[in-house]
Amino acid sequence: HPAAVVRSRGTHFETVPYGDALSPGSEYNLESLLSDLRHVIRTVNPTQVIAPVPFDQHPDHAATAELVDRALAGTSCHPQRLGYLIHTSRIPTALVNTPARALLPPLRMRTYSWETYTLSPAVQQKKTKLLMVYRSQRPYVFLLRNAFVRRNELFFIPQEPATLATTLPPAAPVSR
């Protein structure tokens, strides 16, 4: 329910307790989150927005994609929406470091629109360092680094965010 207030597992608050936040004191609910996202989008007026794809198999990533798409739909801003895919059984995970190999779309998803951006070796090194910053993710990041630090970035180009979830394969739950 969009108006339902949730309690933070970390702070145990139901409202934003930080005075320097965008909306101090606002309730933790969907409408407040969308309002803040729309405010940031209107303020920044981005030409591109990069967020997870809605068919990512990790529920947090799929939910983030939906939130971003809902926020964009509620503004007059029309940036290019690019999506990145992390969790799917259709992307091969390299167990050895293969930065010279290209990151390609999963075979069953190659008919969708994808865009690649070439990364220099220096940018690949910087990306590896940034991935290793997330201590809570380190057991996973080591394998992901090998799978995702490649010679290019790969982005999904959605046709229309509002209909995206109905035109793509459903997300399957991720086992942890």
Ranges and model annotations:
Residues L95-P139:
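A conserved mid-domain beta-alpha-beta active-site/ligand-binding segment of alpha/beta enzyme cores
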